[in-house]
Amino acid sequence: MAALEKNNIYTARIEGYSSEGLGIARIDGQVVFVHGAVRGELCRILVMKVLKNAAFGKVTELLEPSPERREPDCPYYGRCGGCDFRHLSYREELWAKRQRVQDALTRLGGSDVEVEEILGAADPLYYRNKSQYPVSAGKVGFYRARTHDVVDIEHCLIQKPQADAAAAALRDYMRDFAVPSYDEKTGRGLLRHLYVRTNRRGKSLVCVLANGERLPHEEKLVGRLRRAVPDCAGVVLGVNTRRGNTILGERYRTLWGADTLEDELCGLTFRLSVPSFYQVNRDQAEVLYRKAVEYAGLTGGELVVDLYCGAGTITQVMAGGAGRVIGAEIVPEAIEDARENARRNGIENVEFFCGDAAQLAADFAGRGLRPDVICVDPPRKGLAPEVIAAAAQMAPQRVVYVSCDPGTLGRDVKRFAEYGYRVQRAAACDLFPGTRHVETVVLLSKSEVDSKKIRVELSLEDMDMSEF
């Protein structure tokens, strides 16, 4: 087997896609990740980088193009790192995402369950209800792939028009008043990120994240943002003086209007503060949550624990079919929103606790809480081993795992198997059209013999929860 050489051109066929959205080819038995390639294509590939176990390249000539290839519809494609799949038909994109989930569950999770048909989006454009634009060197846009270099973006095909308009207003404000942007390397500069959340009715909440307590000419910035975003609910300053690239602030100050935004999801109303987690694709989130409720198998009397509950969306959707639901979340503002949302929606069979998921889960388990269902929707890094151990100690009949990263999902599925929990069903849901990212819902349960063990029934009234 001859070693691949940098700057040489080889001929190979694309076999599939990597987790990063790159085409996969094999040349002389070696894996090559190929930018902009489509499954099934025969290509001439220029090798640009050679590592010990793999190489990276790009297509120089298409010898046999795929019928699933399309001309990218975004002028920033290839520069902006936001959308990986704008050169694919949507049918091929959905195939790639479902296959990514299947590979993760099989190779990493050791599961032989076949992933159900992927739940695709009805509209793959302008779907993001939350936009976060990094700011750097006077530019407001998105990072170049695998870098923190910002590409200035005037119009994005997956953001709401209100977000692009706010970005233009911030860009002009920086230029007109010589306001410096933040430099990650030096820790100096002021403007770090622009955050825009838009609800179903088109009303928006704007937050400017800054490396300081005040902005120059704040009233001018507010005026420009209000003119750019006609139905603006409020403008908030988020103070983030930490080094690095953390987005959200340590504290917030309202510059004008409201500091929260209301939205409707699954027939319920949710108040959302800036730090509260809320799925960015509202329509597909409803599809995702319906699948999660289906997997939970609720009949009206179950006790459900929802870890990483955010503003209480899944918690309150589950509450409609359960006896009682407990939500846990580490962000105080999100818990405040969750409690207020339950009050507004008239939902009385929910209770929320603020704290670290691992600590709360361990405390729940130690106090003898025995839920019928545990639902988890962790961040991209997945579940800590301590969370899985505590969840298993609570001995639920079913675990519903909502994941935004197939890799960490596969890892966690394997860890759950150590406690006897196996994947029973799995479904992929496309909340992020145009990108490589995909959501997954997995149902885990123990074997039939294990699930028939005698369960200890405890109500919350029987437990001392005063320390939470």
Model segments located where?
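Extended interfacial segments that mediate partner engagement and assembly in macromolecular machines
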Residues: 60-72, 78-181, 201, 215
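Short, solvent-exposed loop/turn elements at beta->coil junctions and helix N-caps
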Residues: 117-124, 184-185, 191-193, 428-431
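Short, conserved phosphate/pyrophosphate- and ester-handling motifs at nucleotide-, phospho-/glycolipid
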Residues: 40, 159, 281
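Terminal RNA-binding accessory module
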Residues: 1-76, 351-352, 359
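Short, acidic/hydrophobic/Gly-rich beta-strand patch recurrent on exposed beta strands
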Residues: 23-28, 141-145, 209, 338
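Rossmann-like S-adenosyl-L-methionine
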Residues: 2-8, 19, 213-468
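Short, aliphatic-rich beta-strand segments
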Residues: 196, 202-211, 269-273
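Residue-level signal for inorganic ion chemistry
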Residues: 25, 40, 83, 194, ...
